[in-house]
């Protein structure tokens, strides 16, 4: 079982930043069997380069749920799954950081599509989305 995820954050330093958006698709190897997506109010400012990159700004997040309000759903949809993400190391670390801030651990195996792309398509000049 896989949980394919994408996360947007307030900046590039996972231990200082917060999540602003998350999307997760639970995939059983044949089809998507569950999904969850939400903006998240990180309770901190978004760095200007991130606003420019993602289009997500603080005003959009004012009424969004806080991480603690969606944490249970994230645990449920990723339970018994391998997390799949582009640059999985960053997304996984910021998820772990957010759960640690709540006093909980979050442990999952990961697959990084950047590393897979580099292995399968070594001739490509770059691997960003």
Show the residue positions of the predicted features:
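Conserved non-catalytic scaffold segment of RNase H-like nuclease domains
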Residues: 1-108, 122-128
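Histidine/lysine/aspartate-rich catalytic loop segments that bind and position anionic ligands
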Residues: 109-120
